[in-house]
Regions:
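Conserved N-terminal alpha-helix of the aminotransferase class I/II PLP-enzyme fold
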Residues: 2-49, 71-78
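Conserved PLP-enzyme active-site core in the AAT-like
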Residues: 37-198
Length: 198
């Protein structure tokens, strides 16, 4: 009998689904961030696109900070809109712009805690308060701050993404990314999605 037919949920049966080294990385980065769970990806942009596309559907609205890494802008402007997600960009440092942009169909707010490359700072707690009052999810790219300098989960983020290639790996010689959040989100929403989309 093939092992994958009888494997339990925590057994390793296929490299893309996980392995002991990746599981240890996920456990440790979740502990650093203060998140319930984590899911490692092949790159930081896989983490960003996986987090957003696993949460959003056609007809949803996203509010995003304008100051973003170029590839993040591409995902928001070109990929999500192609599938019927509407995106509104705001000055991430202006709380009133966030407030004005949120609508009844707003499903998520996305920003970098420290913007790449402008280094603008977004008030995670204040934006999270607005989002949660509207029933929206807060997705924070915390790559420049790292879990050491900015615990985004503790400040109200629901989902946190990292490029492990940069400051987490420390030298840029290996690619990686990670998505962190609640155990329910990671295991019931993100993990099945990422297992089948890469």
């Amino acid at each position: 009998e093939a092992r994958f037919l009888s494997a339990g949920p925590d057994e390793f049966i296929y490299a893309r689904y996980g392995n002991p080294t990746v599981a240890m990385f996920e456990e440790r980065i979740a502990a650093l961030e203060g998140a319930e769970d984590a899911f490692a990806t092949a790159s930081g942009m896989a983490a960003v696109s996986g987090a957003l596309t696993s949460l959003l559907r056609a007809g949803d609205h996203v509010v995003a900070a304008r100051a973003l890494f170029g590839s993040c802008l591409y995902v928001l402007e070109e990929v999500l809109t192609r599938f019927g997600v509407e995106v509104t960009f705001v000055d991430g440092t202006d709380l009133e712009q966030w407030r004005a942009a949120i609508r009844p169909d707003t499903r998520a707010l996305f920003f970098e805690s420290v913007a790449n490359p402008t280094l603008e700072l977004v008030d995670i707690a204040a934006v999270a308060e607005l989002a949660h009052a509207a029933g929206a999810v807060v997705v924070v790219d915390n790559v420049f701050a790292t879990p050491v300098y900015s615990g985004a989960i503790a400040q109200g983020a629901d989902v946190v993404v990292y490029s492990a290639t940069k400051h987490i790996a420390g030298q840029g010689r290996c690619l990686g990314g990670v998505v962190l959040g609640s155990r329910d989100y990671i295991r019931k929403v993100l993990e099945p999605y990422m297992k089948h989309t890469g």
